[in-house]
Amino acid sequence: MNERTSDAFDALLVLSFGGPEGHEEVRPFLENVTHGRGIPPERLDEVAVHYHHFGGISPINALNREIIANVEKELASRDHKLPVYFGNRNWKPFDNEAAEQMADDGVKNALVLATSAWGGYSGCRQYQEDIQGMIKHLESQGQSITFTKLRQFYDHPRFVSTMAQLVQDSYAKLPDELRDEARLVFTAHSIPLTADNAAGTPEDGSLYSTQVKEASALIAEAVGVSDFDVVWQSRSGSPHTPWLEPDIVDHAVELNEKGQKALVVCPVGFISDHMEVIWDLDSELMEEAEKRNMVVERVATVGPTDEFAALVVDLIEEAELKRVIERLGKLPARGSSVNGAPCGDGCCGTAKHKTARVNPNARSAAPAAN
C-alpha cells in the first residue's frame, strides 16, 4: 500500500538515529548501533573515547528537540493541531517506546519525519524498516497505528534557499582578500559504492550520490557560484571496500598543495551539527587546515532554522493534499510510503547493503553516525 491519505493525520513522529547523553550511555549505545555486525569490542572502545571527549554526549538528541520545538511553533502558526513525538533507532527515546506512547494517547494515523533528506538505504529505506519494526511491536501489544513517511526533501525550495543563505553567511566571514578566491566544497556522508549503486529503484541508479550532487548544484546556483566540488566524509569499514570519494580532508590537502588558501565547506548531507560534523569537520579538517595556514569556513546546518521547520510543515501539508509538491530538482524524490513499504520494486537493494556506521572516518576511530 503506497497511497497517500488526505487530512486524517493525528500526529507527527520525528524519527532519528539517537545518541548517548552521558558517559554511562556510550558503550550500550554503541552496542545497539553495531548489534549483529561483528564489530570487535576493541573497536567500540576506540570509538567510545571520542564520545567521552565530549562528555559522553552526542548533540543529536538536543538538536532534534530544537527542531521539534521549532516545528511545533510553525504548526501552531498555521493552525495545525498535530502533536509531535520523538523516537530513535538506537537510543532513548526509543522508537518503539514512542510508538507505544502514541498508541496510548489514541493516535491512529501518524506522519513520520526521518531526519534525512536523501534516498538510499541509510537515508531512507532503513527508516522504513524502523517503521515496520514499530508496527510489529505495537501488534505484540495489541495496538496499531498507520504510519506514513514524509518524502525525501533534498531539493525542496526552502532547503535550497536556506542552505544558500548559510553558504553566503560563511563567505561573508572570510577575510576580504580571500573571499573571491575561496573554493566552495560540499560534503556528505560517504557510503560503500555497492550501497550507492543500489540506492533508489533499479532504474534510478545511484540515487543517493546523484541527489547530493543535484542539491549541491542547486545551492551553488542560488549562491552564484559556478565552480564547486562535491566530496565525502565519515567513511568506515574495511579500507579494502570501495566507498564514495574523495574524502574531505584529503581533498582539502590536495587543493592546498595546488595553492588554494581558503575554503567554504558546506555539510549539505547533514541536517544538524551532530557528532560527525563537529568531529570530522570542526576538529579533523580544521586541524589539518591550521597546519597548512589554510582558512576554512564551515557552513552552518539547516536543522535549527525557522525555515527548516517551515519546510517540515510544508511536507505535512503536501501529505494532507493541501499543498502542491514543491521541488527544484529533476531526480526522483521518493521515500513517502505507508507502513514502511519500499518506494518501489527492488528499492535500495537488500539487507546486504547495510553498513555499520561506527567509525565515520578512516583516519581514526571517530564517533558514530549521529
From Swiss-Prot:
It holds the Pfam family Ferrochelatase. GO terms for molecular function: ferrochelatase activity; metal ion binding. One of its GO terms (cellular component) is cytoplasm. Coiled coil: none annotated. Fe-coproporphyrin III binds at S58, Y127. It is found in: Cytoplasm. The keyword Signal does not apply. PANTHER family: FERROCHELATASE (PTHR11108), FERROCHELATASE, MITOCHONDRIAL (PTHR11108:SF1). Involved in coproporphyrin-dependent heme b biosynthesis. Catalyzes the insertion of ferrous iron into coproporphyrin III to form Fe-coproporphyrin III. This is Coproporphyrin III ferrochelatase. It comes from Corynebacterium glutamicum (strain ATCC 13032 / DSM 20300 / JCM 1318 / BCRC 11384 / CCUG 27702 / LMG 3730 / NBRC 12168 / NCIMB 10025 / NRRL B-2784 / 534). The gene is cpfC.
